[in-house]
Amino acid sequence: MMISILLVFAVSTAYCRDYGREMRATRMSVVDFWKNETKGDGLNVRVAHGVNSWPDLVDQLHEPFLNKSMMIEGDVFMQAHRRPRHRAVPVMKADTKLADRITFKEWLREVATMNKAIKINFRSNEVVRPVLQDLYASQADPTSPVLQYPVILHANVFRSPRSVETEVDPSTFVEKAKDLFPDATLSLGWTKQSNFSHLHPKFKKLSWRQLFHILEYISRLDQPVMLSVRLSVAAHSKEQLLWLLGMDQSISLLLWSDAEDHVTNWTPIVELRRSTTKNRILYDLDPKHRKFLQTDSNEPIATPPTFSLQDWQAVEFSSSGSQLSTVVRSEKGPAFLGEPTALLLSKIPPPNFPSEQKISGKVHFLPKKGMENVDLDENSGVSIYLMDKVQDIDSPKIKNSLEVFIGFDGKIKITNGQLKNLPYYETKSVGQLPDSDCYGFEVTDMGWRVKLDAWTAECGNQKLRKRRTVSIELDTPFQKNRHLRNVVVSKKGDSAVDFLLEELQHKNAYNYRNPWITVVSTILLMIYLL
């Protein structure tokens, strides 16, 4: 009898779980869902803020048709009862003068029938689990209205300078949302702050280090992610935001503003708006800011990618550490984070001799916060391997291969790891560049020789004093099948030094050099093969 009861309970639980997963909210963006009304432009989305009380809900039912909001926003927090035996419940953050607050369950039941997108703002750590449990239970309950419109779960998880509120723990928020409501869009933002207009300009931008910190929470999520960014911050963070939008996963932005936002240079915002598809950015702006963008041109502009997602395959190995160790790909370049456990394999087949191949790019080194003055592994940097067989790779540590290395401290070298009873070849060639955060490079593989040209490069808004270039080369054994080598890119050395390849290209180029040089190269190859 007991076994039968347990079986029935297990089956019913599984049924509810499957039912809930089938009926969860659509993953479509708000812009795509209201495509006819918005004309595919996130600037045309109308948001109803602070719908937290019964009167607010009634107003939503009677709003003018031509000015109808497309998304309802509500704020949830925990209300504790005076009597300890009564547990705290999630309620909406309405005017404190109201005697009876509306609970989150009641609010959800009402807004689910209004045919609008729903944005739920989590205002504390305590409210995360119970609200997500209510959302899950509502979709597993056949009597509850089905959420057929986009649902956005928002929390301010990053602390701002001069913050006036406590941030929600990002790990708890992301993990609970992934487990209990995986089809919602996760929205991450920064805490509210006082006197924003008086902040130093350095606090009004999103740095690359901050961006990498964000990746720790979103890089492995399967569900859509939205980053809520202040307009003034976005105006100074165009490159970082374009990099995020270029990731090979569903990432969008919500740009918001209030009266404290004073934008003096609109060019980055306009370029951001015109450089991406219009449905990737939502705008929740102060009327004066919205009016400016509505009058400005929004014709798309072509921004060629600096990295082809189709040409490179990511291969990851497990890491023993707790920190994020991976490679995150974007059309604006790949980022290598944490331990050196990830590789990028070029899908472009190596050419035949006498053709040559080139690997070019720009690397931006970013030591983790607080690690700038610590003694770091001198072998930390980016490695480009030229390999005969990529099928032999069974770990992130590649051996018996030709390696081209650019270090974070400016050290460059070419190492010949293929030498076996070949005393006529040098083992390595080394060089040194001046200290810089960014270096440009071009590797030329001619089959019998590899050359590296490397130089100091500009980083962001930092002006380069003088470009310095160093070139090194190394003669290498040549394969008897006349194929050049496969290309693999990886991180090497210390986990405290992350880097972004702002540019990375692999090209096969036919040899257009002097014909006599080609003839001599062919003769040398024939002698080697004899």
UniProtKB/Swiss-Prot annotation:
It holds the Pfam family Menorin_C. Keywords: Cell membrane, Membrane, Neurogenesis, Secreted, Signal. GO terms for biological process: dendrite morphogenesis; dendrite self-avoidance; positive regulation of dendrite morphogenesis; regulation of dendrite extension; regulation of dendrite morphogenesis. Disruption phenotype: RNAi-mediated knockdown results in reduced arbor complexity in PVD neurons. RNAi-mediated knockdown at early L4 larval stage results in terminal branching defects in PVD neurons. RNAi-mediated knockdown at the onset of adulthood results in defects in PVD dendrite structure. It is found in: Cell membrane; Secreted. GO terms for cellular component: extracellular space; plasma membrane. This is Menorin. Required for stereotypic branching pattern of PVD somatosensory neurons. Induces and maintains tertiary branches in dendrites. Acts through the neuronal transmembrane receptor dma-1 with cell adhesion molecule sax-7 and lect-2. Residues 1-16 form the signal peptide. Belongs to the menorin family. Component of a signaling receptor complex, at least composed of transmembrane receptor dma-1 and ligands mnr-1, sax7 and lect-2. Within the complex, interacts with sax-7 (via C-terminal domain). lect-2 enhances interactions within the complex. It comes from Caenorhabditis elegans. PANTHER family: CONSERVED PLASMA MEMBRANE PROTEIN, MENORIN (DENDRITIC BRANCHING PROTEIN). Changing residue 131 to M: In dz188; PVD defects. It is a peripheral membrane protein.
